[in-house]
């Protein structure tokens, strides 16, 4: 039987995105232009991105929520994209995890203030790959964000279970402190078939400086991918950066693809750019696209995501993303 679909498991939060005029120093004032509410967290964002891109396969969410207004808003937001939330676990009496995202209009950068809530109560049982599932991929995120899973080797347990149930595995990260990444991620890598990270995460795990002064080093990014494969990643390792992305397959295939040139006037925020990139990669990997095209769709989806301060609202169908990228042109390549 041909496998179809992606199960996305891990931390899901309600993102409360404040678009602010600038980042204030302590004891000074900044103004909020507007506030938007949307479900967030790597599994949700990747799933919403897949559906916005036009994925034709099932996209299922495994996560936790509290029985509160935050949870109701979060799940309604997830369903609005078409995500299957029927397997989200409701934890009675718990606060739904939520994050205040401060997105600066003058820089496009964002800062996060998180209430961990029910994600600190999440266990392996909440995220276990469904028995009998015909899903092709199991995506998990993110080490360093769920206390019980961090302390119990839960991330490895889940990846191992997914493989035993016939799924390919992916692990996505969040910008947690580098020492947490170095502790939690390497033991997971031999259980990951696909592992795609940003320049900060790649540097934290491999010790290779992928970007200097904001500029991507293509050679160093490729070296980081090769080291991740040497650390155990099964089939593909990738590194993405605002200037482009690099991926290396275990069979030796290498792809280096520059990112899309997006005018500063078009950028409303970069909250979901990394997750949008991963969504594009996941769609291509699920559908067995050539590696260059996987990276191109990841870059194009990330570029479109910049048009909204929320994570997924401005992502377009996959063909429209690629057309947008073609119309804007690419940054200088390697």
Where are these regions (language model features)?
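A gly/proline- and charged-residue-enriched helix-loop-helix capping module
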Residues: 91-95
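Phosphate-handling active-site elements
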Residues: 56-60, 253, 284-298
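Short alpha-helix plus adjacent loop in nuclease-associated cores
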Residues: 96-101
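Short alpha-helical functional segments enriched in proximate histidine and acidic residues
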Residues: 81, 284, 305
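Glycine-rich phosphate/adenosyl-contacting loop at the front of the ribokinase-like
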Residues: 1-80, 122, 266-270, 331-334
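Ribokinase/PfkB-type carbohydrate-kinase core domain
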Residues: 1-14, 66, 75-90, 102-256, ...
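Short, small-residue alpha-helix embedded
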Residues: 48-49, 203-206, 267-291, 295
């Amino acid at each position: 039987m041909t496998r179809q679909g992606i199960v996305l498991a891990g931390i899901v939060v309600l993102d409360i995105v404040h678009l602010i005029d600038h980042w204030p120093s302590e004891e000074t004032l900044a103004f909020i232009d507007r506030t938007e509410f949307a479900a967030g967290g790597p599994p949700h964002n990747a799933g919403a991105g897949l559906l916005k891109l036009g994925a034709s396969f099932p996209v299922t969410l495994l996560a936790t929520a509290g029985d509160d207004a935050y949870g109701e808003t979060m799940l309604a937001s997830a369903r609005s994209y078409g995500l299957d939330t029927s397997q989200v676990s409701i934890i009675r009496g718990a606060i739904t995890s939520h994050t205040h995202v401060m997105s600066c209009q003058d820089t496009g950068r964002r800062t996060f203030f998180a209430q961990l809530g029910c994600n600190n109560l999440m266990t392996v049982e909440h995220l276990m790959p469904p028995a009998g599932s015909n899903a092709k991929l199991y995506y998990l995120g993110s080490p360093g964000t769920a206390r019980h899973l961090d302390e119990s080797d839960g991330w490895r347990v889940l990846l191992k279970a997914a493989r035993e149930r016939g799924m390919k595995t992916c692990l996505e990260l969040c910008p947690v402190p580098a020492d947490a990444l170095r502790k939690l991620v390497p033991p997971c890598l031999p259980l990951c078939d696909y592992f795609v990270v940003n320049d900060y995460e790649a540097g934290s795990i491999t010790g290779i400086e992928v970007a200097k002064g904001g500029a991507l080093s293509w050679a160093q990014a490729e070296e980081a991918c090769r080291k991740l494969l040497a650390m155990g990643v099964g089939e593909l390792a990738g590194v993405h950066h605002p200037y482009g992305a690099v991926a290396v397959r275990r069979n030796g295939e290498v792809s280096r693809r520059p990112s899309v040139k997006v005018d500063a006037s078009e950028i409303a925020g970069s909250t979901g750019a990394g997750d949008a990139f991963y969504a594009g990669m996941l769609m291509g990997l699920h559908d067995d696209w050539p590696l260059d095209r996987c990276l191109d769709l990841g870059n194009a989806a990330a570029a479109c995501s910049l048009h909204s301060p929320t994570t997924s609202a401005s992502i377009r169908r996959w063909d429209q993303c690629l057309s947008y990228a073609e119309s804007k042109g690419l940054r200088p390549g390697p």
